Amino acid sequence: MKPLICELGMGVDVHGHDYTKAALRGISDAIRHSSLTIFYTYNRASEMRVDVTIAVCKPEMVDKEAVAAALPHGLVNVEIVKGGLDDKGMGGKEDITIAAVAVKAWLDTANHPFKLVDR
């Protein structure tokens, strides 16, 4: 497997401390700027491996299945780690949740019609 792209995103739940909502918004932020045409050109979208890393203050509060379901193609692996940020909102209570997200897409390039060039 070779890594073909790594996209980064940030997601925020401004009210309510919903860690899954923040994670899903981070995934959307990461992937909405990409069009991985190589997977479609060679009809390999279902063969890509997608690794997702979500960083939030309370990893146990993220629904891994919902995160995996947010990716439209590939075999999805989700890792949730401690990170991100919880902060006080305008009302002075800690209710803002920020998730940092990395989405990496991989493809097995052996016996493939295109070749990656080492530089």
Where are these regions (language model features)?
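Long, hydrophobic N-terminal alpha-helical segment
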Residues: 1-33
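A generic structural motif
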Residues: 10-14, 58, 109
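Conserved active-site and cofactor/substrate-binding residues in soluble primary-metabolism enzymes
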Residues: 18-26, 62, 66, 98
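Flexible, glycine/charged-enriched surface loops at secondary-structure junctions
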Residues: 34-47
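A generic structural signal for short beta-strands and their flanking turns/coil linkers
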Residues: 46-50, 99
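Mid-chain, well-packed structural core segment of small domains
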Residues: 49-92
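C-terminal edge-of-domain segments
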Residues: 76-119
